[in-house]
């Protein structure tokens, strides 16, 4: 039996929500290990739609333990709001069903404000990253800068004021430099103490809980957010998120050893999308892009932003397979391609007249690569709702097999609609 890490193999929005929900029914524990409330996912359980951005997907299922690991940056006010929203939908998130790592760094209002100040300034200079303005990056900066306020600090009101002072020394200098007013000590203390009683009951030693669960033979699902190409090290820097999104982060971001991870599942969309700024070699700024966006309902769960759309890029996914150690992929949204006369797949790049089979690390080179396509015949039948290979048109099967060949990883799961049961299981990741 394997513990499973789920990661996005593209720029996020690959359909992880449905796959994680599908897997969470088989898991005993579901863990978030990086990111914050900037990455939304939609779950459909028993006909009810749940939209989550911070909480692990396991919270909507009875009998599952959900964990927010130390690799997450945690907005306490967003947490309280999301818990209240779920309660209104009939889901009680209680401390016996959810644990938050005691050493998790907090996102405060000053982080959100700084995020917005920088994006506004960057917009004027043409260097905008396209963040969600939710304070994710500034919170990670404070964590690395060793001045973050962490969950455990809410329980120690004697030392908390000193930590707030240290944080404000840094932030108020930044705010003055950006032409904004300072934040007062009392304002931040009030912000923290107002939510402390709602957060502290969930606080625990997550590393110990996970070690006990692992030794007891329970199934652990590690739920990644965003995608590989948004990784702070391995993504299209600087147009990335502020955390490591690759599978290796599951260990560091939760407190388990890497040996506890048995299977890495890469969620992979049958075409490619991206939100925000940055390079996108196969982007289609034409009727194909509009078709994919409309058919695929490509709008962000958190921001509502329209996603950029393009053909499947095997170069990027092949690189993601290598960087993550992906054993199998869950191919999603195949049904969006139904009805196209022809479908293109990027098999390589041309850079300054030479053929390459990887994405360069240089920002300048990333902007210059030209996709090299192979054109496949489309299919007239429908893949929507298919639950076995026999239900798929022959050309759709050919497309899937071609992708497997190009990326060097097999399809473990194939999703054919947003409904969780419309899934073709080839390999159960937990049985690896």
UniProtKB/Swiss-Prot annotation:
GO-annotated molecular function: adenylosuccinate synthase activity; GTP binding; magnesium ion binding
PROSITE patterns: ADENYLOSUCCIN_SYN_1, ADENYLOSUCCIN_SYN_2
EC number: 6.3.4.4
Primary location group: cytoplasm
Sequence positions that bind IMP: 13-16, 38-41, 132, 146, 226, 241, 305
Coiled-coil features, chain-numbered ranges: none
Pathway named in the protein's UniProt entry: Purine metabolism; AMP biosynthesis via de novo pathway; AMP from IMP: step 1/2
Record keyword Magnesium present: yes
Annotated catalysed reactions: IMP + L-aspartate + GTP = N(6)-(1,2-dicarboxyethyl)-AMP + GDP + phosphate + 2 H(+)
GO terms for cellular component: cytoplasm
Subunit description: Homodimer.
Record's function text: Plays an important role in the de novo pathway of purine nucleotide biosynthesis. Catalyzes the first committed step in the biosynthesis of AMP from IMP.
Matching HAMAP family: Adenylosucc_synth
Family: Belongs to the adenylosuccinate synthetase family.
Protein name: Adenylosuccinate synthetase
Gene: purA
């Amino acid at each position: 039996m394997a513990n499973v890490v789920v990661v996005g193999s593209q720029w996020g929005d690959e359909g992880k929500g449905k796959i994680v929900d599908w897997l969470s029914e088989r898991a005993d524990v579901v863990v978030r290990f990086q990111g914050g409330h900037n990455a939304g996912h939609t779950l459909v359980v028993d006909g009810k739609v749940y939209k989550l951005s911070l909480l692990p997907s396991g919270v909507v299922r009875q009998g599952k333990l959900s964990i927010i690991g130390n690799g997450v940056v945690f907005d306490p006010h967003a947490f309280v709001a999301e818990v209240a929203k779920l309660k209104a939908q009939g889901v009680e998130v209680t401390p016996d069903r959810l644990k938050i790592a005691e050493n998790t760094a907090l996102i405060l209002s000053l982080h959100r404000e700084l995020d917005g100040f920088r994006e506004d300034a960057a917009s004027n200079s043409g260097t905008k990253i396209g963040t969600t303005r939710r304070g994710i990056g500034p919170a990670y900066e404070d964590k690395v800068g060793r001045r973050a306020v962490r969950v455990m600090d809410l329980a120690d009101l004697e030392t908390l004021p000193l930590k707030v002072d240290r944080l404000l020394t840094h932030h108020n200098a930044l705010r003055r430099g950006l032409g904004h007013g300072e934040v007062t000590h009392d304002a931040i203390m009030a912000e923290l103490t107002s939510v402390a009683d709602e957060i502290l009951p969930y606080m625990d030693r997550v590393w110990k809980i996970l070690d006990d669960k692992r030794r007891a033979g329970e199934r652990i699902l590690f739920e990644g957010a965003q995608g590989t190409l948004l990784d702070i090290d391995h993504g299209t820097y600087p147009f990335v998120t502020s955390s490591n999104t690759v599978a290796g982060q599951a260990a560091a971001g939760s407190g388990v050893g890497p040996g506890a991870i048995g299977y890495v599942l890469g969620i992979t969309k049958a075409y490619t999308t991206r939100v925000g700024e940055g390079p996108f070699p196969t982007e289609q700024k034409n009727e194909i892009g509009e078709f994919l966006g409309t058919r695929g309902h490509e709008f962000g769960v958190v921001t509502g932003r329209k996603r950029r759309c393009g053909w499947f890029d095997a170069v990027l996914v092949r690189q993601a397979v290598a960087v993550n150690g992906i054993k199998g992929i869950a191919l999603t949204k195949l049904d969006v391609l139904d009805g196209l006369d022809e479908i293109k797949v990027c098999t390589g790049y041309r850079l300054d007249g030479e053929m390459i089979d990887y994405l360069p690390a240089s920002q300048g080179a990333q902007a210059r690569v030209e996709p090299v396509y192979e054109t496949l015949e489309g299919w007239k039948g429908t893949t929507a709702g298919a639950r076995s290979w026999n239900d798929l048109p022959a050309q759709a099967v050919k497309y899937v097999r071609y992708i497997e060949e190009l990326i060097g990883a097999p399809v473990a799961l194939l999703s054919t609609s947003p409904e969780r049961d419309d899934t073709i299981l080839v390999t159960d990741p937990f049985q690896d």
